[in-house]
Amino acid sequence: MTTAIQYQVIPLADREHSNKVASILENKYKTATNKRITLNERFGVLEKGYTIQATEPETVKNDSDVFFVVHDRNLNSKKEFVENYLAKNPIVNSPEKVFEEEDKENAPTKKAVLKPSSTDEKKLTSSDIYIQEITRSILQSV
């Protein structure tokens, strides 16, 4: 998130004002900027009969925020919502299936093998997988 400061040009009460100078200053300082104004710039504006004031900084948001919205109001808790979501959207591509296999010394070991995908299974996009991982983490915390 970045913040940009917008400046407002205000005429001083006891000075003469020129519309040309006012329009030049307003065009220069009307857009929000991350750059701070130096003292030399402030004194230059004061000599022309104006002053500069910073307005409230605008907040520029990135689109990476994640929102969790429950539309069904008949549910009692978020846990029920997540359970219903996982029931309706089963996790098709579980990343690894773990099974036990004996090695050369007959000691049980666990190996991770990817589950083969069939043609009738639903294809998941990265956003679907991301949502399912979020719901899993919420369920584990509840």
UniProtKB/Swiss-Prot annotation:
Annotated region Disordered: the residues are 97-123
Q: Which UniProt keywords apply?
A: Cell cycle, Cell division, Chromosome partition, Cytoplasm, Nucleus
Q: Does Cell cycle appear among the keywords?
A: yes
Phenotype of gene-disrupted mutants: RNAi-mediated knockdown results in embryonic lethality. RNAi-mediated knockdown results in chromosome segregation and cell division defects in early embryos. RNAi-mediated knockdown enhances the activity of the PIWI-interacting RNA (piRNA) silencing pathway. RNAi-mediated knockdown disrupts the localization of tofu-6 to the perinuclear region of the germline. RNAi-mediated knockdown results in larger tofu-6-, erh-2- and pid-3-expressing foci.
CC terms in the record's Gene Ontology section: cytoplasm; nucleus; perinuclear region of cytoplasm; RNA cap binding complex
Q: In which tissues is it expressed?
A: Expressed in the germline.
What's the superkingdom here?
Eukaryota
Q: Where in the cell is it found?
A: Cytoplasm; Nucleus
Site residues, May be required for interaction with erh-2: R42
The GO biological-process annotations, alphabetized, read as: cell division; chromosome segregation; embryo development ending in birth or egg hatching; positive regulation of cell division; positive regulation of chromosome segregation
| Role noted for this protein | Component of the tost-1 variant of the PETISCO complex which plays an essential role in embryogenesis. Within the complex acts as an adapter which binds to the complex via erh-2. Does not seem to play a role in the biogenesis of a class of 21 nucleotide PIWI-interacting RNAs (piRNAs) that possess a uracil residue at the 5'-end (also called 21U-RNAs). May inhibit 21U-RNA accumulation. Required for chromosome segregation and cell division in early embryos.
What does the annotation say about its assembly with partners? Component of the tost-1 variant of the PETISCO complex (also called the pid-3, erh-2, tofu-6, and ife-3 small RNA complex) containing at least tost-1, tofu-6, ife-3, pid-3, and erh-2, which plays an essential role in embryogenesis. Within the complex interacts with erh-2. Within the complex interacts with pid-3 and tofu-6. In contrast to the pid-1 variant of the PETISCO complex, the tost-1 variant of the PETISCO complex plays a minor role in the biogenesis of a class of 21 nucleotide PIWI-interacting RNAs (piRNAs) that possess a uracil residue at the 5'-end (also called 21U-RNAs).
The protein depicted here goes by the name Protein tost-1
Give the gene name. tost-1
